Amino acid sequence: MRIRNFNEGLVLKTIEENSSISRADIGKIVGLTPPTISAIVKDLIERDIVQEIGKGDSSGGKKPTLLKINSKAAYMVAVDLGGENGIRVALMDLSYNIVKEKFDSKIESLNSQKLKNSLSVILKDFIKEINIPKEKILSICIGVPGIIDNKLKKVTVAPYLNWEISLEDLTLKEIGIPISLENDVNLMALGEKTKGIAQKINNFVFVGERTGIGAGIIINRKIYKGANNAAGEVGYLLIDPKYAPKSTRDNGCLEKLASYKVILEKAREKMGKNIRVIDVFKMAAEEDSVALGIVKETLKFLAYGIGNISCILDPELVIIGGGISILPKKFLEEIKMNIQEIIPFVPKIEFSKLGEDGVLIGAAVKVLEPLKKKGLILINSK
Protein backbone atom coordinates (compact mmCIF):
# COMPACT_ATOMS: atom_id res chain seq x y z
CA MET A 1 0.00 0.00 0.00
CA ARG A 2 2.91 2.38 0.69
CA ILE A 3 4.23 1.90 -2.85
CA ARG A 4 0.77 2.56 -4.26
CA ASN A 5 0.47 5.74 -2.17
CA PHE A 6 3.92 6.90 -3.27
CA ASN A 7 3.07 6.35 -6.94
CA GLU A 8 -0.31 8.02 -6.43
CA GLY A 9 1.52 10.99 -4.98
CA LEU A 10 3.79 11.21 -8.02
CA VAL A 11 0.82 11.14 -10.37
CA LEU A 12 -1.16 13.72 -8.37
CA LYS A 13 1.83 16.04 -8.14
CA THR A 14 2.37 15.81 -11.90
CA ILE A 15 -1.29 16.53 -12.71
CA GLU A 16 -1.29 19.45 -10.24
CA GLU A 17 1.81 20.99 -11.81
CA ASN A 18 0.24 20.90 -15.27
CA SER A 19 -3.08 22.61 -15.98
CA SER A 20 -4.00 19.68 -18.23
CA ILE A 21 -2.03 16.56 -19.07
CA SER A 22 -2.55 13.15 -20.69
CA ARG A 23 -1.89 9.75 -19.15
CA ALA A 24 0.95 9.16 -21.61
CA ASP A 25 2.67 12.42 -20.67
CA ILE A 26 2.31 11.61 -16.97
CA GLY A 27 4.06 8.30 -17.62
CA LYS A 28 6.94 10.04 -19.41
CA ILE A 29 7.44 12.41 -16.48
CA VAL A 30 7.17 9.97 -13.56
CA GLY A 31 8.61 6.86 -15.25
CA LEU A 32 5.73 4.50 -14.45
CA THR A 33 4.30 1.94 -16.89
CA PRO A 34 1.07 2.70 -18.83
CA PRO A 35 -0.92 0.00 -16.93
CA THR A 36 0.20 1.48 -13.58
CA ILE A 37 -0.70 5.02 -14.68
CA SER A 38 -4.08 3.86 -15.98
CA ALA A 39 -4.90 2.03 -12.73
CA ILE A 40 -3.94 5.00 -10.55
CA VAL A 41 -5.84 7.50 -12.72
CA LYS A 42 -8.91 5.24 -12.79
CA ASP A 43 -8.91 5.12 -8.98
CA LEU A 44 -8.42 8.91 -8.68
CA ILE A 45 -11.31 9.55 -11.09
CA GLU A 46 -13.58 7.17 -9.16
CA ARG A 47 -12.71 9.05 -5.97
CA ASP A 48 -13.53 12.34 -7.74
CA ILE A 49 -10.03 13.71 -7.15
CA VAL A 50 -9.12 13.88 -10.85
CA GLN A 51 -11.34 14.81 -13.82
CA GLU A 52 -11.19 14.17 -17.55
CA ILE A 53 -11.58 17.51 -19.35
CA GLY A 54 -11.62 16.66 -23.05
CA LYS A 55 -9.18 15.79 -25.81
CA GLY A 56 -5.72 17.17 -26.45
CA ASP A 57 -3.77 17.64 -29.67
CA SER A 58 -2.31 14.64 -31.44
CA SER A 59 0.77 14.40 -33.64
CA GLY A 60 -0.84 11.39 -35.28
CA GLY A 61 -3.31 8.75 -34.18
CA LYS A 62 -5.89 8.96 -31.43
CA LYS A 63 -6.22 12.25 -29.53
CA PRO A 64 -5.25 11.85 -25.86
CA THR A 65 -7.71 12.48 -23.03
CA LEU A 66 -6.56 15.31 -20.77
CA LEU A 67 -6.72 15.25 -16.99
CA LYS A 68 -6.78 17.86 -14.24
CA ILE A 69 -7.24 17.99 -10.47
CA ASN A 70 -10.86 18.46 -9.38
CA SER A 71 -10.65 21.74 -7.46
CA LYS A 72 -13.74 20.74 -5.46
CA ALA A 73 -12.27 17.45 -4.30
CA ALA A 74 -11.14 19.01 -1.03
CA TYR A 75 -11.22 22.33 0.77
CA MET A 76 -9.68 24.37 3.55
CA VAL A 77 -11.10 27.10 5.76
CA ALA A 78 -9.36 30.49 5.80
CA VAL A 79 -9.89 33.13 8.50
CA ASP A 80 -8.89 36.81 8.36
CA LEU A 81 -8.73 38.71 11.66
CA GLY A 82 -6.88 41.78 10.38
CA GLY A 83 -9.27 43.61 8.06
CA GLU A 84 -11.57 46.57 8.60
CA ASN A 85 -14.66 44.35 8.36
CA GLY A 86 -13.87 42.25 11.43
CA ILE A 87 -13.74 38.46 11.34
CA ARG A 88 -13.95 37.03 7.81
CA VAL A 89 -14.20 33.28 7.25
CA ALA A 90 -14.09 31.55 3.87
CA LEU A 91 -14.23 28.09 2.36
CA MET A 92 -11.43 27.75 -0.21
CA ASP A 93 -11.08 25.10 -2.93
CA LEU A 94 -7.92 23.47 -4.28
CA SER A 95 -7.52 26.22 -6.90
CA TYR A 96 -7.46 28.88 -4.15
CA ASN A 97 -10.93 30.17 -5.04
CA ILE A 98 -13.38 31.50 -2.44
CA VAL A 99 -16.38 29.15 -2.48
CA LYS A 100 -18.35 30.61 0.42
CA GLU A 101 -17.67 33.27 3.04
CA LYS A 102 -19.18 35.13 5.98
CA PHE A 103 -18.36 38.20 8.08
CA ASP A 104 -18.80 38.74 11.78
CA SER A 105 -18.28 41.36 14.50
CA LYS A 106 -15.52 43.96 14.49
CA ILE A 107 -12.64 42.50 16.47
CA GLU A 108 -11.41 45.89 17.71
CA SER A 109 -14.39 45.90 20.10
CA LEU A 110 -13.56 42.47 21.53
CA ASN A 111 -11.21 41.79 24.41
CA SER A 112 -8.98 38.73 24.37
CA GLN A 113 -11.46 36.34 25.99
CA LYS A 114 -14.43 37.54 23.94
CA LEU A 115 -12.39 37.16 20.76
CA LYS A 116 -11.50 33.57 21.60
CA ASN A 117 -15.12 32.73 22.37
CA SER A 118 -16.44 34.54 19.30
CA LEU A 119 -13.93 32.95 16.93
CA SER A 120 -14.62 29.46 18.29
CA VAL A 121 -18.37 29.89 17.80
CA ILE A 122 -17.98 31.42 14.32
CA LEU A 123 -15.75 28.58 13.10
CA LYS A 124 -17.96 25.85 14.51
CA ASP A 125 -21.09 27.45 13.02
CA PHE A 126 -19.40 27.99 9.65
CA ILE A 127 -18.29 24.38 9.40
CA LYS A 128 -21.88 23.29 10.10
CA GLU A 129 -23.27 25.76 7.53
CA ILE A 130 -21.04 24.68 4.64
CA ASN A 131 -22.32 21.11 5.04
CA ILE A 132 -19.17 19.45 3.71
CA PRO A 133 -17.82 16.19 5.20
CA LYS A 134 -15.00 16.94 7.64
CA GLU A 135 -12.66 14.56 5.85
CA LYS A 136 -12.84 16.89 2.84
CA ILE A 137 -11.66 19.90 4.90
CA LEU A 138 -7.89 19.59 5.02
CA SER A 139 -7.12 22.39 7.46
CA ILE A 140 -8.05 25.74 9.00
CA CYS A 141 -5.59 28.63 8.73
CA ILE A 142 -6.11 31.86 10.70
CA GLY A 143 -4.46 35.07 9.49
CA VAL A 144 -3.74 37.45 12.36
CA PRO A 145 -2.07 40.88 12.62
CA GLY A 146 0.91 40.22 14.87
CA ILE A 147 3.98 38.14 15.57
CA ILE A 148 3.43 34.38 15.74
CA ASP A 149 5.34 32.08 18.10
CA ASN A 150 5.19 28.83 16.13
CA LYS A 151 6.46 26.72 19.04
CA LEU A 152 3.72 27.94 21.37
CA LYS A 153 1.22 28.24 18.50
CA LYS A 154 0.40 31.69 19.81
CA VAL A 155 0.15 35.33 18.70
CA THR A 156 2.54 37.10 21.04
CA VAL A 157 2.48 40.70 19.78
CA ALA A 158 -0.60 42.40 18.31
CA PRO A 159 -0.47 45.93 19.80
CA TYR A 160 -3.23 47.51 17.74
CA LEU A 161 -5.74 44.90 18.85
CA ASN A 162 -4.37 44.54 22.38
CA TRP A 163 -4.85 40.79 22.65
CA GLU A 164 -3.01 37.51 22.51
CA ILE A 165 -4.48 34.33 21.14
CA SER A 166 -3.33 30.74 21.19
CA LEU A 167 -4.70 27.77 19.30
CA GLU A 168 -5.28 25.95 22.58
CA ASP A 169 -7.64 28.75 23.66
CA LEU A 170 -9.98 28.18 20.74
CA THR A 171 -11.46 24.93 22.08
CA LEU A 172 -11.71 23.50 18.56
CA LYS A 173 -10.26 20.05 19.23
CA GLU A 174 -13.67 18.42 18.89
CA ILE A 175 -13.88 19.64 15.29
CA GLY A 176 -11.03 17.32 14.38
CA ILE A 177 -9.49 19.58 11.72
CA PRO A 178 -5.83 20.74 11.90
CA ILE A 179 -5.49 24.47 12.68
CA SER A 180 -2.60 26.88 12.15
CA LEU A 181 -1.87 30.58 12.71
CA GLU A 182 0.00 32.90 10.34
CA ASN A 183 0.69 36.61 10.10
CA ASP A 184 -1.95 38.17 7.85
CA VAL A 185 0.47 40.18 5.70
CA ASN A 186 2.67 37.12 5.16
CA LEU A 187 -0.44 35.40 3.84
CA MET A 188 -1.13 38.32 1.50
CA ALA A 189 2.39 37.95 0.14
CA LEU A 190 1.78 34.24 -0.48
CA GLY A 191 -1.44 35.15 -2.26
CA GLU A 192 0.42 37.52 -4.58
CA LYS A 193 3.09 34.91 -5.26
CA THR A 194 0.52 32.35 -6.34
CA LYS A 195 -2.47 34.21 -7.82
CA GLY A 196 -1.42 37.85 -7.91
CA ILE A 197 1.02 40.07 -9.77
CA ALA A 198 4.15 38.38 -8.37
CA GLN A 199 3.67 34.95 -9.95
CA LYS A 200 6.91 35.30 -11.92
CA ILE A 201 8.86 37.33 -9.33
CA ASN A 202 11.45 35.63 -7.12
CA ASN A 203 12.14 38.41 -4.63
CA PHE A 204 9.53 40.95 -3.60
CA VAL A 205 8.01 42.73 -0.62
CA PHE A 206 4.31 43.02 0.06
CA VAL A 207 3.43 46.04 2.21
CA GLY A 208 0.03 45.62 3.85
CA GLU A 209 -1.84 48.76 4.87
CA ARG A 210 -4.40 47.30 7.26
CA THR A 211 -5.27 47.50 10.98
CA GLY A 212 -1.54 48.03 11.40
CA ILE A 213 1.22 48.08 8.79
CA GLY A 214 3.32 45.04 7.99
CA ALA A 215 5.44 43.58 5.22
CA GLY A 216 5.56 40.07 3.82
CA ILE A 217 9.07 39.40 2.52
CA ILE A 218 9.51 36.82 -0.24
CA ILE A 219 13.08 35.71 -0.99
CA ASN A 220 13.64 33.01 -3.61
CA ARG A 221 9.86 32.42 -3.69
CA LYS A 222 9.72 31.67 0.05
CA ILE A 223 8.50 33.73 3.01
CA TYR A 224 11.38 35.11 5.07
CA LYS A 225 10.37 35.28 8.75
CA GLY A 226 13.63 36.05 10.55
CA ALA A 227 15.06 34.56 13.75
CA ASN A 228 12.06 35.55 15.89
CA ASN A 229 9.31 35.44 13.23
CA ALA A 230 9.36 39.26 13.36
CA ALA A 231 10.73 39.99 9.87
CA GLY A 232 8.41 42.44 8.15
CA GLU A 233 7.21 44.24 11.29
CA VAL A 234 7.78 47.52 9.47
CA GLY A 235 5.17 49.33 11.55
CA TYR A 236 8.03 49.88 14.00
CA LEU A 237 10.20 51.74 11.46
CA LEU A 238 11.22 55.11 12.90
CA ILE A 239 10.02 57.73 10.43
CA ASP A 240 9.80 60.69 12.82
CA PRO A 241 11.35 60.67 16.35
CA LYS A 242 8.32 62.56 17.67
CA TYR A 243 6.24 59.42 17.09
CA ALA A 244 8.67 56.91 18.60
CA PRO A 245 6.87 54.30 20.75
CA LYS A 246 7.03 54.85 24.50
CA SER A 247 7.43 51.10 25.12
CA THR A 248 7.87 47.89 23.15
CA ARG A 249 4.15 47.17 23.62
CA ASP A 250 3.19 50.50 22.07
CA ASN A 251 2.29 50.96 18.40
CA GLY A 252 5.26 51.54 16.14
CA CYS A 253 6.13 54.89 14.58
CA LEU A 254 5.03 54.11 11.01
CA GLU A 255 1.76 52.65 12.28
CA LYS A 256 1.13 55.87 14.24
CA LEU A 257 1.52 57.83 11.02
CA ALA A 258 -0.06 55.71 8.28
CA SER A 259 -2.28 52.86 9.54
CA TYR A 260 -6.05 52.41 9.10
CA LYS A 261 -6.56 53.61 12.67
CA VAL A 262 -4.81 56.92 11.99
CA ILE A 263 -6.67 57.43 8.71
CA LEU A 264 -9.97 56.80 10.51
CA GLU A 265 -9.17 59.20 13.34
CA LYS A 266 -8.39 61.99 10.88
CA ALA A 267 -11.35 61.21 8.64
CA ARG A 268 -13.91 61.00 11.45
CA GLU A 269 -12.70 64.27 12.90
CA LYS A 270 -13.19 66.04 9.57
CA MET A 271 -15.79 63.97 7.70
CA GLY A 272 -18.15 62.35 10.22
CA LYS A 273 -18.14 59.45 12.67
CA ASN A 274 -19.68 56.86 10.36
CA ILE A 275 -17.05 57.00 7.62
CA ARG A 276 -14.96 53.89 6.90
CA VAL A 277 -11.38 53.65 5.67
CA ILE A 278 -12.53 52.27 2.32
CA ASP A 279 -14.81 55.32 1.95
CA VAL A 280 -11.84 57.63 2.46
CA PHE A 281 -9.89 55.86 -0.29
CA LYS A 282 -12.87 55.96 -2.67
CA MET A 283 -13.44 59.67 -2.03
CA ALA A 284 -9.75 60.43 -2.52
CA ALA A 285 -9.91 58.62 -5.86
CA GLU A 286 -12.80 60.94 -6.76
CA GLU A 287 -10.69 64.00 -5.84
CA ASP A 288 -12.56 64.92 -2.64
CA SER A 289 -10.25 67.56 -1.14
CA VAL A 290 -10.47 66.43 2.50
CA ALA A 291 -10.03 62.73 1.72
CA LEU A 292 -7.27 63.56 -0.75
CA GLY A 293 -5.35 65.49 1.90
CA ILE A 294 -5.58 62.60 4.37
CA VAL A 295 -4.54 60.01 1.80
CA LYS A 296 -1.64 62.05 0.42
CA GLU A 297 -0.22 62.52 3.91
CA THR A 298 -0.59 58.78 4.55
CA LEU A 299 1.14 57.93 1.27
CA LYS A 300 4.06 60.21 2.12
CA PHE A 301 4.81 58.35 5.35
CA LEU A 302 4.17 54.98 3.71
CA ALA A 303 6.63 55.95 0.96
CA TYR A 304 9.30 56.75 3.53
CA GLY A 305 8.77 53.29 5.02
CA ILE A 306 9.07 51.66 1.58
CA GLY A 307 12.23 53.66 0.96
CA ASN A 308 13.78 52.25 4.14
CA ILE A 309 12.75 48.71 3.18
CA SER A 310 14.25 49.15 -0.29
CA CYS A 311 17.60 50.27 1.12
CA ILE A 312 17.91 46.99 3.00
CA LEU A 313 16.37 44.45 0.60
CA ASP A 314 16.50 46.05 -2.89
CA PRO A 315 13.50 43.95 -4.03
CA GLU A 316 12.47 43.34 -7.64
CA LEU A 317 8.99 44.57 -6.77
CA VAL A 318 7.08 46.22 -3.92
CA ILE A 319 3.34 45.46 -3.81
CA ILE A 320 1.06 47.68 -1.73
CA GLY A 321 -2.09 45.96 -0.55
CA GLY A 322 -5.12 46.30 1.67
CA GLY A 323 -7.96 48.75 1.07
CA ILE A 324 -5.50 51.33 -0.19
CA SER A 325 -4.98 49.27 -3.35
CA ILE A 326 -8.31 50.50 -4.78
CA LEU A 327 -6.66 53.88 -5.43
CA PRO A 328 -6.00 54.78 -9.10
CA LYS A 329 -2.54 54.16 -10.50
CA LYS A 330 -1.68 57.88 -10.44
CA PHE A 331 -1.27 57.60 -6.66
CA LEU A 332 1.67 55.25 -7.25
CA GLU A 333 3.48 58.19 -8.86
CA GLU A 334 2.90 60.16 -5.66
CA ILE A 335 4.53 57.36 -3.68
CA LYS A 336 7.49 57.15 -6.07
CA MET A 337 8.04 60.91 -5.89
CA ASN A 338 8.13 60.73 -2.09
CA ILE A 339 10.61 57.84 -2.19
CA GLN A 340 12.84 59.82 -4.56
CA GLU A 341 13.18 62.44 -1.83
CA ILE A 342 15.05 60.03 0.43
CA ILE A 343 16.85 57.43 -1.73
CA PRO A 344 18.50 57.53 -5.20
CA PHE A 345 16.90 54.30 -6.46
CA VAL A 346 13.17 53.64 -6.57
CA PRO A 347 11.89 50.06 -6.78
CA LYS A 348 9.12 48.98 -9.10
CA ILE A 349 5.88 49.52 -7.16
CA GLU A 350 2.38 48.22 -7.88
CA PHE A 351 -0.97 48.11 -6.09
CA SER A 352 -2.30 44.63 -5.35
CA LYS A 353 -5.15 43.39 -7.51
CA LEU A 354 -6.26 40.82 -4.93
CA GLY A 355 -7.41 43.39 -2.37
CA GLU A 356 -8.50 42.00 0.99
CA ASP A 357 -9.01 38.56 -0.60
CA GLY A 358 -5.24 38.15 -0.48
CA VAL A 359 -5.29 36.93 3.13
CA LEU A 360 -7.78 34.17 2.34
CA ILE A 361 -5.97 33.13 -0.84
CA GLY A 362 -2.64 33.15 1.01
CA ALA A 363 -4.08 31.01 3.80
CA ALA A 364 -5.11 28.44 1.20
CA VAL A 365 -1.64 28.59 -0.36
CA LYS A 366 0.05 28.08 3.02
CA VAL A 367 -2.01 24.97 3.71
CA LEU A 368 -2.27 23.45 0.24
CA GLU A 369 1.03 24.26 -1.49
CA PRO A 370 3.19 21.96 0.69
CA LEU A 371 0.67 19.14 0.25
CA LYS A 372 0.56 19.62 -3.51
CA LYS A 373 4.34 19.59 -3.79
CA LYS A 374 4.42 16.27 -1.98
CA GLY A 375 1.47 14.94 -3.96
CA LEU A 376 -0.27 14.02 -0.73
CA ILE A 377 -3.68 15.62 -1.15
CA LEU A 378 -6.45 13.12 -0.47
CA ILE A 379 -4.18 10.10 -0.93
CA ASN A 380 -5.83 8.46 2.05
CA SER A 381 -9.39 9.62 1.28
CA LYS A 382 -11.77 6.94 0.15
Where are these regions (language model features)?
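ATP-binding/phosphotransfer module of carbohydrate and carboxylate kinases, centering on a glycine-rich
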Residues: M1-G61, L66-F103, E108-K136, I175, ...
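Phosphate-binding/catalytic loop of phosphoryl-transfer enzymes
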Residues: V79, G86, L138-R249, G362, ...
